[in-house]
Regions:
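Catalytic nucleophile loop
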Residues: 1-2
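Hydrolase active-site cap/lid region
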Residues: 6-71
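Amphipathic, non-transmembrane alpha-helical secondary structure
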Residues: 10, 86, 167-171
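A short helix-to-beta-strand connector/capping loop
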Residues: 15, 93, 136-138
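Active-site nucleophile elbow and catalytic-triad environment of alpha/beta-hydrolase enzymes
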Residues: 69-88
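Short, proline-enriched alpha-helix->beta-strand connector loops that line the catalytic pocket
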Residues: 90-97
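C-terminal catalytic histidine-bearing segment of alpha/beta-hydrolase fold enzymes
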Residues: 97-111, 118-177
Length: 177
């Protein structure tokens, strides 16, 4: 959802007043490569089905992998770490943007065997940093801690919508001109 919201703000002629995203994957080149790596490192060659789906879907959407179709990955990504021109994020230089993330690396290591290369926090912070350097002072990264619980059973999971303070987010949205 968050990746789509950011891409919408980048590409549509009717611009939203503000955009927010909750721990979105932003760099689909990184997403593809981390899924490939996770499969390679999987225990007993039992690959996570989500990683297999991600690779298949991205190859269908782009016509191949990042090595052969990098320009297509740049087009579908809200942010691309390796795109030194950063065509896509320049379109966000005047739009207030909030990106929420809870990079609980110890949880990821223990529960999923994942490291920073497999989570979205790195590219979320990189995108906000680059937008700030482009002059967008209204681009903000909100990093939470111990807020991530999935409903209805309150299971701990850092990639959860519960990291957002809903009342505070609504106040922020309503304040946008």
């Amino acid at each position: 959802g968050g990746s789509c919201a950011i891409k919408y703000a980048e590409n549509e002629s009717v611009k939203p007043k503000a955009v927010f995203a909750i721990d979105p994957p932003l760099d689909f080149e990184r997403f593809y490569n981390s899924a490939k790596r996770d499969i390679r490192l999987s225990k007993d060659r039992q690959a996570n089905e989500e990683n297999i789906y991600i690779i298949d879907r991205l190859e269908k959407e782009t016509g191949g992998n990042p090595s052969t179709h990098l320009a297509e990955y740049y087009k579908i990504s809200p942010y691309s770490f390796s795109d030194t021109v950063q065509t896509e994020i320049k379109k966000l230089s005047t739009i207030p943007l909030r990106v929420y993330t809870e990079p609980d690396i110890n949880w990821w290591l223990k529960e999923r065997g994942a490291d920073f290369t497999s989570i979205n926090a790195t590219e979320c912070s990189a995108m906000i940093n680059e937008l700030n350097k482009l002059g967008n002072e209204d681009a903000v990264l909100i990093v939470t801690q111990n807020n991530s619980y999935r409903k209805p059973d309150n299971r701990r999971h850092p990639h959860s919508w519960s990291i957002v303070d809903n009342a505070e987010l609504i106040k922020w949205l309503l304040k946008q001109p």
